[in-house]
Amino acid sequence: MGRVWLAIVLCGVGPLVSATDLSLSSDRVEAVHSARLTFEQIGSVVLKSSSAEYSSGLRLLPAAGESGFDLSSGRYLAADLESLASHQQRVCLQVRDSSRDTYAGIALDPGEKTTIKLHLPHDFIYASPEGAKGVKTLDTRNITDIAFLVVWPYEGQFSGLLNVRISNIRLAGPPDHARKVALANYLPFVDPYGQYLHGEWKYKVRTDADLRGDLARERGELKPAPEAWDEYGGWANGPQLEATGHFRTEKVNGKWWFVTPTGHLFYSLGINVVKTDSDAPNGYMHRDWYVSPPQTAMSFPTWNLRKKFGKTDFAEDYYDFVLDRLDSWGINTIGNWSDGALTKLGRKPYMLAFDLSGVDLPKLSGGFYDTLDATFADKLKASVQAAAQVAGSAQAQAVTDPMCIGFFIGNELSFPTDSAYYEPFFKACKEALAAVAPSKLYLGSRFKSLRNSEALWTAAAKWCDVISVNSYVASVAVFTDGQYAAPKFDRPVLHSEFHFGTLHRGMFSAGLCPVGDQCERARNYKRIVAGALRHPYFVGSHWFQYRDQPLVGRGDGENYQIGFVDVCDRPYPALCRAAREVGEMMYNVRAGK
């Protein structure tokens, strides 16, 4: 992989603060499930486990006679880690009070030494009135246990799965008391730009002039696409393979790749949900939440972009700007759920979906499709054909567009335990797509996890050109190692969704993979893509999503700080720089140079 991937700016944790006893003494540390602990004289503990199941790991308990840890005097809980494994591994730090928990994750390369930190959501700082949106808090004065483990396990069982030295657990940095708001003064909490009203941060927008000034400033900072790329974002100086005029896949030197229409190797580095807007909650609900209550469904990003570009019909100008942004960030693919107006510009490779929601297909009682019903395949084919023939739609153009890599059909489906339904589903999807877009790749149905039965992997591998998986973990490097549910197939895999978030810029939730701060978001981005690049199956890594979710939540309540840009279209610089570094180096890295 080379040393460059380890040359990451260390993320600071702030000064050490006095705290409750957090020493790793043998009388207060217990192994969980299959974990094994070795206590060292220097005060550290080596944690080893061959399994990620059942919270396998290390648990630190309060001292005898105490009900919990008092972590109220620090902004972060931090610990030093050293990887003793021969593979990239992931570790999570978790804290729990009497009823709730939170965690932060990190990936470690072999031999790497670093610090993991968890942003403590103090209830005495982040409390919000009942019924109003806010941070999920913990009683940090009485934390019942601290644990090091692997959350959302997908890994197969193998010796040395987890092998890490843990030391110097500590509190760092003072709590952010300035964030505290008296409950009586909390409402309203959303400012006219969709930001958290009561917080202060470097990139906060305060006037319309701030938005107008952003455009010229950022345009002056944008860079061209990496020099190593061809016109598709493929490896211009790599091997020349057969050019077919459309994207395809090929295994080269033991690793799967996409191949561009001109015959160059291509690793898909993408971002999902690239749009002008975001999910728009109903503005007429909870009007007391807003400084400027909207009358209907509101989209603060849309309103902010109108001010930024000085007109209501800004979309064309904005998407030209976005495409320049993606080049500058080292992103070569427009991911799923993005605006068709953007993909139809034909300037960057993209992936689209045929949506099955609302399609009249026979179903089982559990919600999955009755793929054994005699009408299923024909109905599915008809729905795909109808969608592909809608005049002016992104799908209609994409079926013959060289920039279109392929199509997903379905998303995070709940497959039944009966494997008899698997192959008929994938077969019907493959044949339906082949009937309308024979030159396009069938990209699967975006599994909701890397953990699936061997029967499901096998059925997908038989019919999918690429198997897509949404997996919110810090590393995918050991996905095919071990014996438990290890997929036995040889087919390219797309990591179709992942992200890292933190409590920053006033946001209330860090998403499905919380980390300590923006520096950690960037670091984890580089680590997870590096692990995928080393793996022979992965052909792409797609971040979810382009923009932070609404502060008050989308329709299902998600309000994650997970974007490359915030609600005011201001980028997160550390994450953008990390993506650029990956985009510049990924071809040499995947080729083992």
Regions found by a protein language model. Give the residues of each.
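Extracellular glycoside hydrolase catalytic/binding regions
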Residues: M285, W289-T296, Y421-R527
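Short carbohydrate-recognition loop motifs
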Residues: A35-R59
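Active-site groove signature of glycoside hydrolases
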Residues: A387-A420, A435, L443, F538-Q545
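Active-site-adjacent substrate/metal-binding segments within catalytic domains
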Residues: E200-L345, V359-M403, A428, F544
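Aromatic-rich peripheral "rim/lid" segments of glycoside hydrolase catalytic domains that contact
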Residues: F544-K593
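Substrate-binding cleft of secreted/luminal carbohydrate-active enzymes
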Residues: I405-G406, F498, C513-F564
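Short beta-strand-plus-loop segments that form exposed binding edges in beta-rich domains
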Residues: L149-Q157
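Extracellular ligand-binding interfaces
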Residues: S50-G134, N142, S159-R165
